Amino acid sequence: SCTAGRSSFITGQSVLRTGLSKVGIPGAPVGMSDKIITIAALLKEQGYATGQFGKNHLGDLNHMLPTNHGFDEFFGNLYHLNAEEEPEMENYPLNEPDMPHFKERFGPRGVIHSFATDVDDATEMPRWGKVGKQKIEDTGPLTAKRMETCDDEFVERASKFIKQAEADGKPWFVWVNTTHMHMFTHPKPGSKGQAGRWQSDYHDTMIDHDKNLSLIHIS
């Protein structure tokens, strides 16, 4: 699981200390503890604008979201891609009479856009828990079709965040985790074949991935 590397990077702690080697199924109580301090939280105390964009994979309950752990803004997905594609798979139990409301009970959250706030919202969201000091919007599921372009969304939002911080004269810390090159790889239709003859969807998407990284560098 990529959770181990992500957690070590953002917390500066070993997986043996945090227990964040992997997370469970959607809605599982496994993920970022409220007691864990991130580099984002420390930098925010020093006046930094802090943003996280793209894949998180450190737990999907509200108290585990990046905007509850030092980030001013988060826009991204919370799982490995195959988990988010499962509801579109042929054998997913959407309408099984012996498994009613399966997706509502066990399915993944969509792409989340959240902001840290000073107001403690006591609202309890079914499955995901108390909102807390953040504003949370589910922008819709990360479908196989959206996977073609979701990194473009994340990079665009990250670039806007950086430019706004610069305009405000604030130092910034931005953590960008694209979904590419994770399984499964869904290239944009216009990108197919761009890597040349005998190449694959993976190679075609890698070119788009490199382009997105360059957009962040020039922000």
Go through the PLM ranges and name each one.
Residues 1-219:
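Formylglycine-dependent sulfatase
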